[in-house]
Design a protein with these regions (language model features):
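Active-site loop of short-chain dehydrogenase/reductase
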Residues: 6, 86-88, 133-146
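Conserved NAD(P)H cofactor-binding loop of Rossmann-fold oxidoreductase domains
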Residues: 93-99
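Rossmann-fold cofactor-recognition segment
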Residues: 53-69
């Protein structure tokens, strides 16, 4: 698949697998939308992205997926539409394990955070971005886990 000028949204792009994916896809000529919680980490990843292709652009979007709402997902749609007017792929990479403890000590608030980041946010982002994603000739959605 030719990734030149394809626009790819990567969640959890501030480090780890998300950072590597962003850097490697940019080397293939993709426009990268970096989505993560930590603006300073996102800035560092942005600085590592390849900008050598003429029309290549990248975008940083800061969001805490544990708190993602319909409104904030819609703001992400607007930002991507204004910058690129297209979206060819989403890589749902953001995930957390939560507290490593026995059930009796596991706090409900931590469980809610795990569910929000790992399940609710990918669902809500995909649902919200579906309209712009469907305009792509070959849209892709990838879910990762580690």
């Amino acid at each position: 698949m030719d990734l030149l000028n394809k626009t790819i949204l990567i969640t959890g792009a501030s480090d780890g697998i998300g950072e590597v994916l962003a850097v490697e896809f940019s080397k293939l000529g993709s426009n990268i939308v970096l989505l993560g919680r930590d603006p300073s980490k996102l800035d560092k990843v942005y600085d590592r992205l390849d900008h050598s292709f003429g029309s290549q652009k990248h975008l940083i979007l800061q969001a805490d997926l544990s708190l993602l709402s319909n409104e904030s997902a819609h703001e992400i749609l607007i930002a991507i539409t204004e910058e690129f007017n297209c979206l060819d792929g989403i890589i749902h990479n953001a995930a957390i394990l939560g507290t490593m403890t026995t059930l009796e000590y596991y706090e409900l608030s931590k469980w809610d955070e795990v569910l929000n980041i790992n399940l609710r946010a990918p669902f809500l982002l995909t649902k919200t971005l579906k309209s712009i994603l469907e305009d792509s000739s070959l849209p892709r959605i990838i879910f990762t886990s580690s």
